[in-house]
Amino acid sequence: MNLNRMEKIMELKKLIVDLSSLMSIGGFERFEREKLLSLVADSFDENYLDNVGNQIFVKKCGKENAPRIMLDAHMDEIGMYVTEILDGGFIRVTNIGGIDTGILQASDVIIYGKEERLFGVIASTPPHLASGSGKELPKIDELLIDTCYTKEELESKIRIGTPVGFAPKYTEILNNKIMGKSFDDKACAACAIYAAATTPREDLVGDVYVMLSCCEEVTGMVAPGAYALNPSYAMSIDVNLGRVPGTKKEETVELSKGPSITISAVTDRKLTNMLINTAKEKEIPYQISVSPTHTGTNAVSIQLAREGIPTVDVGLPLASMHTYNEIISLEDTKTLCDLVSAFITDKRIAEEFGKGGLGI
């Protein structure tokens, strides 16, 4: 690996870690917007919030009647909301997004109070005191967070509906991989931002709109954003299930083998094939992922907005999805950036799908 590529990977890694440290539980994506802006706003010509909370960053190409190219990666992360404050400093919660309750016990969390952040741990029953077989996964409303405060102290600091998230963490592991929380989908958001920011303006074939969309893990709010933006064409960027022992090969992708490009009945086949051809020509490693119907990402919502927005779905391989120890390959993140950059500089795609002007 040449030094220049390694330097770029290190820059990208820092952005991934910085973004993943921001609290953005579904419904609270704007909680640390000022920190987000301090990280990335200077790399774009403008930024704004739409009516539902999607955060858009714009880089203009400087050409008249240029196509609008949308890059979507969701900003929200899985987490919890407080549902009950109990005696003894305990809190009951409900989940926001899919959480594996089997990994929650004894994990450390942060409760984002009115004026301060409180630390807690999800209470765990010692094995020798547990009843039953121990094989049943606890339900989310059966778990309690221990804060060590009194009920009265808690009620002065938090309320029902207060968000609770996993404590920020990041670890470098072997073979150029890193582990941490909310890489789904902050790692992809970082790749979209980095690719748009570092691609020379004169190489862009259209104005690039990076949309950090909200609430993908729950209902999804990208559709109103895509409708309002009305891009000429779009790329949805999300994580894909990383292959580990016991998983099906046809349902997963390998880490360190490049990003995935999805073949689906509901995304644009021609745009997908053109991206695959571009990846081949530029010798960008990629994997094919097959999702016959719904992709499980924002791609479908974008594709179905307005009269239909041509959309391609790409993925970053990720292991231990929806846990606080998600694993990604740094080599995959840089390769994903290469693929995104190729997408926003591809003249053939722009000629085929670019509508010009406002995309009308």
Residue positions per predicted region:
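N-terminal hydrophobic/helix-forming segments and targeting peptides
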Residues: M1-I360
